[in-house]
Amino acid sequence: MNLKLVFESGDPVLIGVFVLMLLMSIVTWCLVVLRCIKLYRARKGNAAVKRHMRDTLSLNDAVEKVRAVDAPLSKLAQEALQSYRNYRRNEASELAQALPLNEYLVIQIRNSMAQIMRRFDYGMTALASIGATAPFIGLFGTVWGIYHALINIGQSGQMSIAAVAGPIGEALVATAAGLFVAIPAVLAYNFLNRGTKILTQDLDAMAHDLHVRLLNQKDS
């Protein structure tokens, strides 16, 4: 099966299908590489943050130690402590009088977690869409190619196996291309989705720890 024959045939639809497959494959692998690097750095940074938070009694000191660490847990700890300080600084305000510290911290920590996780959601929709649509786009290219191959064979009057196998074989490559693009996209989506879930679990655990420590915080 020679892809060169597909492009030499001049069929714009079949050529468009293969070009689209190529673009989808490039997008998939770019997203996979970028997301894997980002998740790796996040896990490595989170491990350092956990270690500092566990080994340091004072929350203020722990947050200062992790301030230079570029990690989701570091950002969450900094924003949670800043929210606590803002509340203590404005305890005389109407908001502080109407909203207990416990509820205020829950709201602020949840908002921080949502903002942090948005940074790790990019590309997932694209991977899911590519994994779901690539096989059907490839199948469309195959159906289109077979249809036009049969028309050309009928017009030429050549009904030999060699005349049928060549054009139809080239059209079937579109289905294989669709699977070649879709399978890595689906596997990458599942792998990255699991990585994101682990990150969410780490954030949940850290949020609970920060909430408890801030409620018992004596210093500001």
Swiss-Prot record:
Q: Which GO terms describe its biological process?
A: protein import
Q: How does it assemble?
A: The accessory proteins ExbB and ExbD seem to form a complex with TonB.
Q: Give the stretches traversing the membrane.
A: 13-33, 126-146, 168-188
Tell me, what does this protein do in biology? Involved in the TonB-dependent energy-dependent transport of various receptor-bound substrates. Protects ExbD from proteolytic degradation and functionally stabilizes TonB.
Cellular-component GO terms for this entry? plasma membrane
Which InterPro entries does the entry mention? ExbB/TolQ_transport, MotA_ExbB_proton_chnl
Q: Which subcellular locations apply to this protein?
A: Cell inner membrane
Q: Which domain of life does the protein's organism represent?
A: Bacteria
Return the similarity comment. Belongs to the ExbB/TolQ family.
Report the protein name in the record. Answer: Biopolymer transport protein ExbB
Keywords from the named record: Cell inner membrane, Cell membrane, Membrane, Protein transport, Transmembrane, Transmembrane helix, Transport
Per the record, membrane topology reads: Multi-pass membrane protein
Species of origin reads Neisseria meningitidis serogroup B (strain ATCC BAA-335 / MC58)
Q: Which Pfam families match?
A: MotA_ExbB
